[in-house]
């Protein structure tokens, strides 16, 4: 490594005020011994009135480790901070006088360097240096008591290779050697900054010299940066970066931090209930028990959701899914429950053919018909032991975005009075009202739905056994469209 001694020649030449400095150093030997880790700086220039000021480099051992290998500092177009950070301890200031602390970076020599065979060597003459910029500490101006109270940090200073940088960063050339300097200027109201009579002093630390690079050349410097800089994530593995991010966030946050990879997996696995993923909507025991005996068959909230293929292929069709009778509600406990007639098709097959009336209502053979109200009341008390809470009805998990279909004219409306009184308890969307009313028509030449009792007419058919016409609350009523379906063709 070729160091130029011309730049630091003033460091070894005594100035006019050095005898007084030597006396002060003799008096403060104990003080220097106490802070031996940060010895006094090499003083380049001291004006009259600034003689007693001492500056000590913070983390001198770390700077020495880098200096022995050959310190490198990354420069980018946007600007990059230095590491190790430039921090100093200042003593000897007048507590009541205001000072301005600033820093600049000057060329250490007139050479251009290259890194080959694991060492730096001179490769040519240096490029013309850009006009030097000064970085003024953000706390300036401040009293001497303020500067001496704590460490003075220049960690916000950034280095750039953009010669047109508009942000005030220090402009450097790559593969050139530079030396940082710190200046202490007395802020006098009578004398403006930069005038001939302004008192200031400059301090230089040779171990802070570095070579500006766009990428680290020496792998030893890279290793030192990783070991000592908690923010040097660019050369670590992805797992180390993730763990480092989590540890930093966990130390400042009270809630647990989840890795990004886990979040992506969870988001990818959980789908909306309308995309066909039944796992996206997990039903609790209380909710599933309240849907367990609707319409004479047991079902869960998952059974009421459409499969993915049918939803995407038939977005404009209402379709039914076969539901199984659960083992939790055997037919012996609930005599009104009758299973569906088994068909030869698979359980996952979606069908659009019209069912017979006995099948759609869960009746088999000549079993007596029981009204909907009695079935709902029995289901209420036969469900889970905990008191039922208001849960969304089947209309709430239907397809509200599907427009209503045109319904052909029907001859009679045997369910008209029952539905009108029942739907008066709550306001329903237009689509559901149209769909429910269309199902109430039973006799149609093209419907293909047969009535179980031709002799019973209207309300006589509904209440053939003389049961009381009790209307259950709206949260327990059932949409009759779950099991009854018109014969829709593909054209509709």
UniProtKB/Swiss-Prot annotation:
Cell compartment(s), UniProt: Nucleus; Cytoplasm
Tissues with expression: Expressed in the dorsal optic cup of developing eye, pectoral fin buds and heart. At 31 hpf, when the pectoral fin buds have begun bulging outwards, restricted expression is detected throughout the mesenchyme of the early fin buds and these high levels of expression continue until later stages.
Annotated spans, Disordered: 1-43, 331-352
Any GO MF annotation of the entry: RNA polymerase II cis-regulatory region sequence-specific DNA binding
Keywords in alphabetical order: Cytoplasm, Developmental protein, DNA-binding, Nucleus, Transcription, Transcription regulation
Keyword Transcription: yes
Alphabetical list of SUPFAM superfamilies matching this protein: p53-like transcription factors
Polar residues bias spans: 31-43
GO CC terms, sorted: actin cytoskeleton; chromatin; cytoplasm; nucleus; protein-containing complex; protein-DNA complex
DNA-binding region: 62-237
GO biological process: animal organ morphogenesis; atrial ventricular junction remodeling; atrioventricular canal development; atrioventricular valve formation; cardiac chamber morphogenesis; cardiac left ventricle formation; cardiac muscle cell differentiation; cardiac muscle tissue regeneration
Composition bias, Basic and acidic residues: 17-30
Role this protein plays: Required for pectoral fin formation. Together with tbx5b, involved in eye and heart development. Required for the looping stage of heart development. May bind to the core DNA motif of promoters.
Description of how the protein assembles with itself and partners: Monomer. Homodimer (via the T-box); binds DNA as homodimer.
PANTHER family per the UniProt record, alphabetical: T-BOX PROTEIN-RELATED (PTHR11267), T-BOX TRANSCRIPTION FACTOR TBX5 (PTHR11267:SF28)
Entry comment, domain topic: The T-Box domain binds to double-stranded DNA.
Protein's UniProt name: T-box transcription factor TBX5-A
Organism: Danio rerio
Lineage: Eukaryota, Metazoa, Chordata, Craniata, Vertebrata
């Amino acid at each position: 490594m070729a160091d130029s001694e011309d730049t630091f020649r003033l460091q070894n030449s005594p100035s006019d005020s050095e005898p007084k400095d030597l006396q002060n150093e003799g008096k403060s030997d104990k003080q220097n011994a106490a802070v031996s880790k940060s010895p006094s700086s090499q003083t380049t220039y001291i004006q009259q009135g600034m003689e007693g000021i001492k500056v000590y480099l913070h983390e001198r051992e770390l700077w020495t480790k880098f200096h022995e290998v050959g310190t490198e500092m990354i420069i980018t177009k946007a600007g990059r901070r230095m590491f190790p950070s430039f921090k100093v301890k200042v003593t000897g200031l007048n507590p009541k006088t205001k000072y301005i602390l600033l820093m600049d970076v000057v060329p250490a020599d007139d050479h251009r360097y290259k890194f080959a065979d694991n060492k730096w060597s001179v490769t040519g003459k240096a490029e013309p240096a850009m006009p030097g910029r000064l970085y003024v500490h953000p706390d300036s101006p401040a009293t001497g008591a303020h500067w001496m109270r704590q460490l003075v940090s220049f960690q916000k200073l950034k280095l750039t290779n953009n010669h047109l940088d508009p942000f005030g960063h220090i402009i450097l050339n790559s593969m050139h050697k530079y030396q940082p300097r710190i200046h202490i200027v007395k802020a006098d109201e009578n004398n403006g900054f930069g005038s001939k009579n302004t008192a200031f002093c400059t301090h230089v630390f040779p171990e802070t010299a570095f070579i500006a690079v766009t990428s680290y050349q020496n792998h030893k410097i890279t290793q030192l940066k990783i070991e000592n800089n908690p923010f040097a994530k660019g050369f670590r593995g992805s797992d180390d970066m993730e763990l480092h991010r989590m540890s930093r966030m966990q130390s400042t946050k009270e809630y647990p931090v989840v890795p990004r990879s886990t979040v992506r997996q969870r988001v990818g696995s959980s789908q909306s209930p309308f995309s066909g993923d039944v796992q996206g909507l997990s039903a609790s025991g209380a909710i599933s028990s309240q849907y367990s005996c609707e319409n004479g068959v047991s079902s869960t909230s998952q059974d009421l959701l459409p499969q993915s293929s049918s939803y995407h292929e038939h977005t404009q069709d209402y379709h039914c899914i076969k539901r199984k009778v659960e083992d939790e509600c055997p037919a012996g406990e609930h005599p009104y429950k009758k299973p569906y007639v088994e068909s030869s098709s698979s359980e996952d097959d979606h069908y659009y053919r019209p069912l017979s009336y006995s099948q759609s209502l869960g009746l088999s053979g000549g079993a007596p018909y029981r009204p909907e109200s009695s079935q709902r009341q029995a289901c209420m008390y036969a469900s889970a032991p905990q008191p039922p809470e208001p849960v969304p009805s089947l209309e709430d998990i239907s397809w509200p975005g599907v427009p209503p279909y045109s319904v052909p004219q029907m001859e009679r409306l045997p369910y008209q009075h029952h539905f009108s009184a029942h739907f008066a308890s709550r306001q329903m969307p237009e689509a559901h009202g149209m769909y429910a009313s269309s199902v109430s028509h039973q006799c149609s030449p093209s419907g293909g739905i047969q009535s179980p009792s031709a002799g019973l007419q209207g309300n006589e058919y509904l209440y053939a056994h003389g049961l009381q016409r009790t209307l259950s609350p709206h949260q327990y009523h059932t949409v009759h469209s779950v099991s009854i379906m018109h014969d829709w063709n593909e054209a509709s």
